Amino acid sequence: MATPAVMYLRRAFPEAEIAMISRRSTAGVWDGHPGIDRLIVGDDRTAARELREVVRSHRFEAAVLFPNSFRSAWFMWRCGIPRRFGYARGARSWLLTDIVVYRPQEWQTPTPQPVSKKSLRESKSLPREQPRHMVEYYLELASYVARQLGSDIAPPVVTRESALPPLVLPVQSQALEVVEKLITEEGVTSIPLIAIHPGAAYGNAKRWPLDRLAVAADRLADELGAAIVVTAGPSEAELCAELVRMLRARVLNWGPRLNIPQLVALLSRSTLFIGNDSGVTHLAAAVGCPTIAVFGPMDWNVTCPWSANAVVVRRSPPCAPCFLRECPLNHECMTAVTPDDVIAAARTLLSRQQGERNERA
C-alpha cells in the first residue's frame, strides 16, 4: 500500500537515488520496482550491525519511515542519516528530525472497549467520519517529505471510490514464465483459475473458516468451469492440505512453493482471487485481479484492498474491529460470513467487470 507514495517520491525527486530497505519476507514486492533504484534486504536481528554498515556506506541524506515501529526509527538513528521523516508514534519522536503529527481520529475506526456494555455503546456511538486509507497515510508522509526537501511537484489526487492513485506492482517476465510452465504441466491452460489463499500471518482471528471457503470455492469453480489454485505462506502448508481435502473441484495445491514474484504472476493470470485480510490479498488487488476479501477483526476502512476490482465481505458485530490475533469470544465477525455472501460478491464483481469489457469493445 506504500507503492503510490514511493512512486510520488520518484516523480518529486527524479535525480535522487531511492533505496528501499525491506524484510526478506517481503523483498520480492520491491525487486525490480520502478519506484526505487536499489533494494537493501535484511531483517535478521543478529545481522543488524552488518545492515547498518551497508546503509551507512551509501551516505543517504534522508530516510522516510513508512513503518510506525520504534525499532525502525532507532535503526535509522543508529545509521546516522541526517534527515529522518516519520509519524510521531510509539514514543519515537526524539529519534526523528522531521515529524508528521499522528491524528488517530483520521486513521482508525473507533475500537470497542469491552469493559462494560456502557463503554462499548459509547465507543461505537462517537460521531466520526470514515477513517482515511493507508494509501493516504503513506502519501501524506511522502507529501510532507517532498515539501520539506524542496520539491514543487504536487502529490496525486486521492479518489477512494476509484482507488486512485493505483498500487504499482509490475509482473516480472521471468516469474510469469515459471507460472505459465506450471499451468501447462497441470493441463489447465485453457480454463479460468480461481486463486485462494486461506491463511493470514497475523493470527487465526483473521481466517475465514475453511469449510465455508471450500463451499464457496467449489460452487464458483462449477459456475465458471474453473480450476482452483491454493497458495500459502511458508508455515501454512498443513492449512492448505486441510482445505484441499475439503474441495471437490479440480484443485492445484501449490502451497508455499511460489515466491512473491511468482505469486504476483499467478494472481495476474487468475480470473478471481478469494482470501482473508492478508498481504496476498493486497497483491491480488495491486495487479488488478478481481478480489474478494473476507474481513473480520481488523479495520476494513483503513486496510481494505485498494482496487476498483476488489470487494470486502464482512459482518460487523459490536466488538469489531478488535485487532486481536485470537478471538476470546465466538469469532462472530468471521463465522457470520456465509458462502452465499462470498458467492454473491464474486458474481457481482465478475458481472460488472464483464460489462466494462463489453463497453470498451
Question: Where in the sequence are the language-model features?
Answer:
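Catalytic machinery of carbohydrate-active enzymes
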Residues: 1-361
